[in-house]
């Protein structure tokens, strides 16, 4: 059933924006950023939108979902675990990202990876990994597995 505010369908995220120092949007660093996103996640530069040292937009497989990078004199700074997330449709897709990230890290040690792990909530198993490269925010990728006969969720006991 549709939400009453959105009878045409649920809204969805369409982009994430981050500010960077202009040097990171210069030709060499921009090329490194594009290589990571293309080789690991399959995202492509929207070259017609690129402005050297000013703007880079990466299409997240479809043109209406993207990462928007813009230069700023006072660029974004955040802790490593501040992140944005994507979902994939299979555990094999997620494992593929892990494999490509590991391969990419062999040639560029700036890639940081928190390996594939699973959080079993009983009704859903959330498989995820975290990967970052150059940008201030980390990317989390998840696959949600819904078991046929889920266990009831039991919250962890709190220490007292």
Where are these regions (language model features)?
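A short, terminal or domain-edge coil/loop segment
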Residues: 63-74, 96-112
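Short, well-ordered turn and helix-capping elements at secondary-structure junctions
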Residues: 20-22, 71-73, 117
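A short, hydrophobic/aromatic-rich structural module that often spans a beta strand
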Residues: 46, 52-87, 93, 156
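Core segments of cupin and vicinal oxygen chelate
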Residues: 18-66
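Secondary-structure boundary/capping residues
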Residues: 25, 46, 93, 110-111
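Vicinal oxygen chelate
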Residues: 1-26, 76-160
